[in-house]
């Protein structure tokens, strides 16, 4: 549904021209851009979010600033039509709601929106537009961003950590993407780039400032400057030639798609107002040439649309992991996926040498089963384990991973999008071999798209410890773990999560729970509560006494309910702003 939302946003944005035919042409040009289809093929959901959000955001920013619609008999400069106070309240509320939802899923898109609004302000100063209106639009975008941050508290605090910027723009890669100018111009971020005819849509974009007048010239200038800067940033960021990292190429190119739509709409309107009927010169053939390129530029998407597959791979890495590693009959477990950021599923945590890692429960690589990369678990517990492998400080890393329930380690190699058999993404030298040298990791037969190691020492996320493991669990520290045979634990309470608490008859002994110690996890046996105790130095266990019917529950702190109540009130407040009478 994100792609049609983007089309509707382009329709709203192209309303800057007071000509329905020109507006329709702009929407068609936006739909012809292969960016979202390449994102679908490559599984880049953040690019899809950018494609859907950015035209709506630019439309609301324009409306808040008071930049009006280009009309036939306008004067030089922007058409300014400042909204009333009530209208501005409604517009900033809409922006806050849009930015709040976007920030929850893709904060890097908000960064690109603010950059676009700033470039519009600079364009107004250069081309003779209304700097006051553009400045008001930028101020409205900043206010909406602040509101969006508040709406997403306290979860936004994860971006204040040491790797907060990586969480926003993505982790650095081992090798740069280095797409090159041609691929950037044709939005070639994935297999469904649809050839090179799309570059013909740049002709109307570049010609529009040359043949248009008055407010149409200002809008054409905005589109050209924003697209040129966006393309330059995407090109430099792709080649890793900037002193800082920016969002991925597809997100940086999303404003260019909006600019192509504006350029197409402006050239159609300008041809009928500023070109046709005037003294014959170079402007007429140039404008006519740009009109001819429009249908040619949309041909690829028209040809590819009936199939609807957009060259997607037949199966994804996540689907393969679910099929191969989804058996939970022996208890709940975790999968540690570590590799190139372009192959590791989202919510990754940055490691060294351009690698990232992510944790999933029970082989299901979905958002609900991900262990947040912003948690202390990912930052404090997993990284030292990877360090131990990289430094060869132990040959028993499987035993160190066992308390966390890590059963499989997956190194993705090929996704048939970013990494193919003909052009695989390289891994750091000796990376695979370091895992293969571990004595308690067994190389499992799997597809060529990934390397799978199974931890022979893994302990179920919830399980009754074996006698030997129970004796050593109170010792803590890596030395006790490495020296202990941890097999033989019995899985219990399968399916336990912070929101689901199944009950089961369990025997006497020591119940291991593979979560970092948290007193809010409570075990009840026959209705009596049991307090958790530290286990293996990182996780926790419960003494079950004589056993009985057990249930493991997570009790949310009072602050969680206060935050939910506060967020609900804020959302109601924003909703009232959206419903402000016109």
Q: How would you label these PLM feature ranges?
A:
Residues 214-241:
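Transmembrane alpha-helix segments characteristic
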Residues 3, 244-273:
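Hydrophobic/aromatic-rich transmembrane helices and adjacent perimembrane loops
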Residues 295, 326-408, 412-418, 472-485, ...:
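Extracytoplasmic/lumenal acceptor-recognition loop(s) of multi-pass membrane glycoenzymes
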Residues 404-479:
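Aromatic/acidic, Gly/Pro-rich catalytic loop(s) in extracytoplasmic/lumenal soluble domains
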Residues 136-218, 250, 312-324, 331, ...:
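Periplasmic/ER-lumenal interhelical loops and adjacent helix-loop junctions
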Residues 475-582:
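Active-site-proximal, structured, solvent-exposed surfaces of multi-pass membrane proteins
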Residues 271-300:
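Signature aromatic-anchored transmembrane alpha helix within multi-pass, membrane-resident enzymes
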Residues 3-16, 21-126, 140-156, 335:
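Membrane-embedded helix bundles of polyisoprenyl
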């Amino acid at each position: 549904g994100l792609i049609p939302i983007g089309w509707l946003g382009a329709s709203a944005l192209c309303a800057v021209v007071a000509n329905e035919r020109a507006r329709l042409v702009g929407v068609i040009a936006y739909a012809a851009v292969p960016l979202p289809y390449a994102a679908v093929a490559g599984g880049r959901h953040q690019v899809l979010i950018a494609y859907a959000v950015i035209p709506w955001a630019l439309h609301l920013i324009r409306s808040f600033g008071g930049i009006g619609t280009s009309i036939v008999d306008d004067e030089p400069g922007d058409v300014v039509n400042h909204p009333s106070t009530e209208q501005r309240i409604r517009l900033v509320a809409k922006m806050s709601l849009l930015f709040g939802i976007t920030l929850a899923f893709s904060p890097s898109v908000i960064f690109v929106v603010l950059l676009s609004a700033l470039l519009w302000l600079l364009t107004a100063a250069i081309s003779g537009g209304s700097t006051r209106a553009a400045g008001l639009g930028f101020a409205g975008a900043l206010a909406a961003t602040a509101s969006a941050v508040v709406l997403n508290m306290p979860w936004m605090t994860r971006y204040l950590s040491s790797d907060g910027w990586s969480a926003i723009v993505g982790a650095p890669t081992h090798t740069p993407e280095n797409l090159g100018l041609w691929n950037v111009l044709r939005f070639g971020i994935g297999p469904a780039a649809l050839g090179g005819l799309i570059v013909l849509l740049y002709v109307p974009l570049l010609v529009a400032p040359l043949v248009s007048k008055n407010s149409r010239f200002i809008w054409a200038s905005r589109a050209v400057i924003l697209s040129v800067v966006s393309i330059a940033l995407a090109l430099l960021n792709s080649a890793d030639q900037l002193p800082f990292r920016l969002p991925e190429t597809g997100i940086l190119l999303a404003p260019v798609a909006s600019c192509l739509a504006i350029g197409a709409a402006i050239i159609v309107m300008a041809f009928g107002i500023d070109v046709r009927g005037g003294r014959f010169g170079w402007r007429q053939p140039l404008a006519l040439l740009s009109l001819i390129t429009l249908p040619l530029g949309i041909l690829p998407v028209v040809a590819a649309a009936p199939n609807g597959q957009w060259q997607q791979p037949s199966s994804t890495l996540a689907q393969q992991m679910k099929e191969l590693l989804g058996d939970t009959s022996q208890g709940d477990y975790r999968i540690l996926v570590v590799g190139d950021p372009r192959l590791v599923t989202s919510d990754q945590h940055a490691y060294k040498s351009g690698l990232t890692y992510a944790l999933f429960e029970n082989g299901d690589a979905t958002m609900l089963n991900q262990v947040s990369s912003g948690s202390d678990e990912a930052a404090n517990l997993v990284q030292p384990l990877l360090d131990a492998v990289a430094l060869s400080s132990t040959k028993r890393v499987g035993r160190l991973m066992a308390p966390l329930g890590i059963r499989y380690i997956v190194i993705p190699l090929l996704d048939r999008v970013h990494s193919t058999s003909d052009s695989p993404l390289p891994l750091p030298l000796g990376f695979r071999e370091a895992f293969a040298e571990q004595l308690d990791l067994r190389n499992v037969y799997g597809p060529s798209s990934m390397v799978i190691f199974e931890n022979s020492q893994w302990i179920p996320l919830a399980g009754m410890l074996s006698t030997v493991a129970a004796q050593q669990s109170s010792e803590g520290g890596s030395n006790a773990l490495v020296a202990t045979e941890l097999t033989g634990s019995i899985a219990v309470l399968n399916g336990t999560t912070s929101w689901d608490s199944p009950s089961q008859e369990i025997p006497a002994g020591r119940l291991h729970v593979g979560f970092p110690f948290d007193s809010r996890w409570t075990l009840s046996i026959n209705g009596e509560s049991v307090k958790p105790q530290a286990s293996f130095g990182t996780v926790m266990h419960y003494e079950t006494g004589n056993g009985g019917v057990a249930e493991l529950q997570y009790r949310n702190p009072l602050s969680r309910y206060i935050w939910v109540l506060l967020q609900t009130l804020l959302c109601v407040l924003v909703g009232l702003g959206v419903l402000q009478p016109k």
